[in-house]
């Protein structure tokens, strides 16, 4: 079974400054010396967690998507993170949706906190954040997603989610399937404030234990434009809840090799998922293959 090389980038972000953020992140990606296959960026990595989509949103042919396509192709990596997207409908990782959003300035316009799973060949998967953070007004500015995205690479299945989704375990719950667990890695990209970092750290471990999977949480550091401090606390956790990586209060670029055999062994020795209640989240999500 192939291991999967994943790099996390915990960084400060320039408030609502796309050019500065994209330049900074490209330099950090270029600085990665180890071999890597997947690079994970924070939530709204090109702007910070802004409630000004009318000013900052792009369509699917905008600056951020073009940057992701170019960097992914040049570095031969999968690149993932979320940005502020303008679209007419929820995103779907299929050809019909791609064609629609490329020409979409149709009415009504919606704004999404949209995660992209970008492949080196320019294909991509889409996940629109399901749970909007009403405490900060996200529900007043952004439309909720309706579909999960489970991507596939090298025999690994990866469930991709965004920040506040972490508080809602049903959305991440392993679905009942004849072939076994639905995914092997659960990734959260975030702008999670330091004042609630205990919840962040605790829930990341809980999601790993209850779903018997690796969990990767990538958060930003520093103060945002509202003066809210983010301590980072990016983490990588194994299926037993063991913390493999944790970085607090500073920028960091970290690469890890995830072990598929380790996941398989834990699930065979402790087959807890087989005892779970059988239920289905209201959609089957999307799948992207590499």
Region roles according to the model:
Residues 2-8:
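Extreme N-terminal starter segment of soluble prokaryotic enzymes
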Residues 7, 116-118, 125, 235, ...:
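Conserved hydrophobic/aromatic positions in well-ordered beta-strands
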Residues 10-15:
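Short polar catalytic/cofactor-binding loops
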Residues 18, 26-120, 125, 193-206:
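Cys-nucleophile CN-hydrolase/nitrilase-fold catalytic domain and related Cys-dependent amidase chemistry
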Residues 39-40, 157-162, 187-188, 216:
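Short hydrophobic-aromatic micro-motifs
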Residues 58, 70, 89-90, 99-178, ...:
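Active-site catalytic loop in hydrolytic enzyme cores
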Residues 62-80, 166-253:
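CN hydrolase (nitrilase-like) catalytic-core segments centered on the catalytic cysteine
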Residues 150, 220-290:
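C-terminal beta-strand edge segments of enzyme domains
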